[in-house]
Amino acid sequence: LKTDIKPVGKSPSGVNIYSFQYKDMEGTYEGVMAHEVPWASMMNDNGYYMVDYSKLDVEFKKLN
């Protein structure tokens, strides 16, 4: 689960980009919200959505 979600911009194609933290992980990350990119999202076996960043013009990044 993501926490501390903050908008940081948009990709060239208009996809919203956010910074966020994961509840059970250290660090801050940058990426998208799966519900905003259904063409690039899938549900994993645990019931959480995952994003296939190869279908987007956004790079998933660990900021710190």
Regions picked out by a protein language model, each given a short descriptive name:
Residues 1-64:
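C-terminal intramolecular chaperone/autoprocessing and neck/assembly modules of extracellular spikes
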